[in-house]
Amino acid sequence: MTKGILGKKVGMTQIFTESGEFIPVTVIEATPNVVLQVKTVETDGYEAVQVGFDDKREVLSNKPAKGHVAKANTAPKRFIREFKNIEGLEVGAELSVEQFEAGDVVDVTGTSKGKGFQGVIKRHGQSRGPMAHGSRYHRRPGSMGPVAPNRVFKNKRLAGRMGGNRVTVQNLEIVQVIPEKNVILIKGNVPGAKKSLITIKSAVKAAK
């Protein structure tokens, strides 16, 4: 069965194992998620569990949103997402960090940091041109393609806005779970800025 929870990225730190091994970790604060709706094939066409995370003031919610969360006897939520392959939950149930254990392998999804308008060297990792005095270009994108089509093909790697994309990093290891603080420590880095929404769920491609 799939495990899943929504959380907020706090930042990065480091811990040491009993043997003295140094491990960089990302701190994820995941307060209990509330099950707002259980979707079924009969009513919705597919099976999923809808959960809400991070309370918000009622004045910021409209009437339909208030009625939706009222079925679960909870406050309006800032973030609402769905998880598939989660069974045995009812509306109003809570998902906490206690479902995870140290050593679990998970996939982490977040929104990458926005970098603004960037050139091809930073955005796509292309090499720069010669920096000599006679060089015709230094940081430009280079050839636009052959003459014959009289146009630039789609998906040509050019300058543009970088970052702000939905990114999933697979097969990250949970190093430690601290239930009393609703905190999960994940080995390595995860996408997103501090205080951004993070989705944690069981790894799809984990070694069995």
UniProtKB/Swiss-Prot annotation:
Q: Which InterPro entries match?
A: Ribosomal_uL3, Ribosomal_uL3_bac/org-type, Ribosomal_uL3_CS, Transl_B-barrel_sf
- Provide a GO CC annotation, any one: cytosolic large ribosomal subunit
Would the keyword Ribosomal protein turn up in this protein's UniProt record?
Answer: yes
List the PROSITE patterns hit by this protein, alphabetically: RIBOSOMAL_L3
Q: Does the keyword Hydrolase apply?
A: no
- Keywords from the UniProt entry: Ribonucleoprotein, Ribosomal protein, RNA-binding, rRNA-binding
Q: Which GO terms describe its molecular function?
A: rRNA binding; structural constituent of ribosome
- Which SUPFAM superfamilies does the protein's record reference? Translation proteins
- State the superkingdom: Bacteria
What exactly does this protein do?
A: One of the primary rRNA binding proteins, it binds directly near the 3'-end of the 23S rRNA, where it nucleates assembly of the 50S subunit.
The record's note on quaternary structure and interaction partners says: Part of the 50S ribosomal subunit. Forms a cluster with proteins L14 and L19.
Query: What is stated as this protein's family in its record?
Result: Belongs to the universal ribosomal protein uL3 family.
Protein name, per record: Large ribosomal subunit protein uL3
This protein's encoding gene: rplC
